[in-house]
Amino acid sequence: MVRQALGQFGQIDILLSNAGVTRRADIMDLTEADWDRIHRVNAKGVFFCLQRVAREMIPRRSGRIINIASIAGKGYEGTSNAAYAASKGAVISLTKTAAQQLAKHNINVNSVCPGVTRTALSEDNLRVRAQQEGVSVEEMERRRAAVIPLKRANDPEDIAAMVVFLASPGARNITGQSFNVDGGLIPD
């Protein structure tokens, strides 16, 4: 992936690590295989991608690294999977450590922590939950919105807006931060 990007563009100025898998499961139902798969993608993949791209950014003394974490990694009680929450907590910790170590190379590292976001996967999960609870999808959407202080789930564009800002010159002195985009679910 990095070689391909370098071949096509000549350099990498911005890395957006957006990796995430999960499985809706109670903590007592998670298996070692679940844990390993979730951490392999969500934490290990982000780490090694960050490391590889940082090697390209260091000689140029410039770069922006933006990791997509989750409010689950900050202890949001609505999280449905402990392995997922732990993996996203690892991404938040990685962001802070990488920011400290890469600052001397003028590389900014931040993370975005989305809350409930409308995606094909989340909407499929909403339909499954509605069916399991014997209610309409519309009722599940109302329930979901009711717990969010701004009364709406994110659209992907809400996350993208924060990413664009963090990649912009306006964020040149921001590093080591994890920004919630969650409608106020877990204020920091």
Give each language-model segment a name.
Residues 26-27, 34-36, 65, 144:
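Substrate-binding pocket helix/loop in short-chain dehydrogenase/reductase
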Residues 30, 76-85, 97:
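Active-site loop-to-helix junction immediately N-terminal to the catalytic Tyr of the SDR YXXXK motif
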Residues 50, 87, 95:
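Active-site helix of classical SDR
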Residues 55, 100-101, 172:
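Alpha-helical segment proximal to the catalytic Tyr-Lys
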Residues 70:
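Residue(s) in the substrate-gating loop at a strand-loop-helix junction
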Residues 75, 152, 163-164, 175-188:
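Short C-terminal tail/terminal secondary-structure segment
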Residues 103, 108, 174-176:
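Short, small/polar-rich loop/turn modules that mediate ligand/substrate recognition or access, typified
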